[in-house]
């Protein structure tokens, strides 16, 4: 990588599936040299996701692992484990979503690694934080959606417990992990020493949910029930127009009054249910019904033009297919095309955020399993004979 704010930072990434790879992809997108350490079987996401041209290179894996290099090590073998420890001794950051007791058994606890690398930032992404009864239990996204209350919010909104059809707890926790790694790197600049970070999925998502839905139970004793009634309303969704759907968000008084004018209901500006933000919140369901009825009068494009002129927040309802061809995303070059060395032409996204002080971050393809094993071993100072022996004994693999 070059030109990003994390240029010069080396990250050893011992993570799999989504939560960890999202964290390390974020660091890689902004310039870090991320070395993905994989077992001989490879990251589970290589094969568990549908959609691929070749085995072990699913579309999801390609999306979550761009801008990284891959080294394939069997750390059950001493030589493979020694390579991993040597890699970590050269790193600024080590990030893993292996459960802590497994890391400790392998001699990969923070206390073990900090002896050789006291400046190491050691990030452990776990399901549940230390000190609680769930610590060391395995966790995946639906487990955390269930226990954190995410599924319960959908139950209250739709009438049945459901998961958000995205791995949102993985995405959210992965992004938070990248964020706190940045905080730790900043502190290291001031102190000169590293530290261990624990990033628990459950606690982070419990914070996410309760920030919105603890509401009246913030007070002791509670002054009302949990839940944001506006967000849990069955009308909190895209609403139908004459020919499709649209989402409108008239929250301020100016926006709400402009919306009432647009739908031909100016009298609602003085209706005591809707004349200020507090009253609109208290009468959220009635406010949604007004919007629902008003929006049926015109087409989506007609409404978008009217709302743009009146500065009322509104946007079209996009299908996933629409997103892939959204004119705004095309204008900002969000999607690009890449010739992958083994997968051929693929569509890819770019990092969403930009920095005025940095150059354009170079983009490299998601690696095949063990694609960079030999070159990384060479960087670590291993001789050709040593590398050959590691490959022959299966301690290191060139992959495929």
Feature locations, PLM:
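Short, surface-exposed loop/helix-turn segments at secondary-structure junctions
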Residues: 47-50, 215-226, 326-340
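Conserved Rossmann-fold dehydrogenase catalytic segment
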Residues: 130, 158-168, 189-205, 224-231, ...
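Terminal low-complexity tails and localization/encapsulation signals of metabolic enzymes
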Residues: 1-10, 234, 240-241, 322-400
